Amino acid sequence: MSLTYMNMFMAFTISLLGLLMYRSHMMSSLLCLEGMMLSLFVMMTMAILNTHLTLASMIPIILLVFAACEAALGLSLLVMVSTTYGMDYVQNLNLLQC
């Protein structure tokens, strides 16, 4: 395993640990999710470039599309929770009702 792959795996692991440890605030959870998606994007791009697999070259772009949708939904939930309750705790997501 090369050094760059190990660095990206460590970035993913640290983001996952941050997501598991700091679950109280929604903004920190969203930042950890974005770090995970960024490290996955870089790992997939490096793997495709190293293997010269041209048929799978669209997969990182599709991952970025899903990451953008996830970020938009997360930020809209953050705005909704913070305007309704005045704080961005994850536990307030259980109180949201239609």
UniProtKB/Swiss-Prot annotation:
Enzyme Commission number(s) from the entry: 7.1.1.2
GO molecular function: NADH dehydrogenase (ubiquinone) activity
Membrane-spanning intervals of the chain: 1-21, 29-49, 61-81
Main localisation: mitochondrion
Disulphide linkage map: none
Topology in membrane: Multi-pass membrane protein
Domain of life: Eukaryota
Catalysis: reaction(s): a ubiquinone + NADH + 5 H(+)(in) = a ubiquinol + NAD(+) + 4 H(+)(out)
Keywords: Electron transport, Membrane, Mitochondrion, Mitochondrion inner membrane, NAD, Respiratory chain, Translocase, Transmembrane, Transmembrane helix, Transport, Ubiquinone
Annotated family: Belongs to the complex I subunit 4L family.
Record-linked PANTHER family: NADH-UBIQUINONE OXIDOREDUCTASE CHAIN 4L, NADH-UBIQUINONE OXIDOREDUCTASE SUBUNIT ND4L
Protein name: NADH-ubiquinone oxidoreductase chain 4L
Species annotation: Vampyressa melissa
Gene for this chain: MT-ND4L
